Amino acid sequence: MQGPNSRKILEKFIWTPPTQPKISELQWFRFTICRVKELSGIPLLVSRTGYTGELGYEIWCHPSDAPKVWDVVMDAGKDEGLIPAGFGALDLLRIEAGLILFGNEFDGQVDPFEAGVGFTVPLKTKNEDFIGKDILIKRKENPQKKMVGLELAGKEKANHGDCVHIGRSQVGIITSGCISPTLNKNIALCRIDVGHSELDTEVEVGKIDGHQKRIPAKIVSFPHYDPKKLKVRS
């Protein structure tokens, strides 16, 4: 359940024991063990997590209880604008929020710094050795690529794998792109050479063979939506 009313909706039907945090007390990336409505209700685990860039929660239950939980959730949200949404909507939101997807922004050949999640690597806080530590230190000290946001001209969206050029030289690659309904802009995520990663740098997104058709674009602040993460922390 994601969106500004998600906490309000959950509070209508979540019961928590005294030993667990209430929904109103649940911090970012934390969870609570709870039940539907009362002590004898359906057992749940609710985490303050999501993949949308909005205030949101994820509800976990036994598979056999899922239909009943779904009905409770939809009934609680019927007056708050709650509607079902699929992966298409989720993908738009995560691109706007700059949230990475395996197979797009990263894979086994892309390090966390190139994928834009270098903050997850505990180089300063973990003294113990771990697999890949020495290599990650070197990669951080000598970055080659950087994840940036692009804003494209026109309404033809960039697709995963489209090349990014300055002149005839390829300097990057599109990892994800969409026409953002929230921002009303044509946006993309791009992994680009660090030497061309400054804000407002003008580039071109190549279509067809990368040369016959080009879409003008420029590097903008990343992520595109709520860069300070104020909504998810609200």
Where are these regions (language model features)?
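Conserved, structured C-terminal
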Residues: 1-234
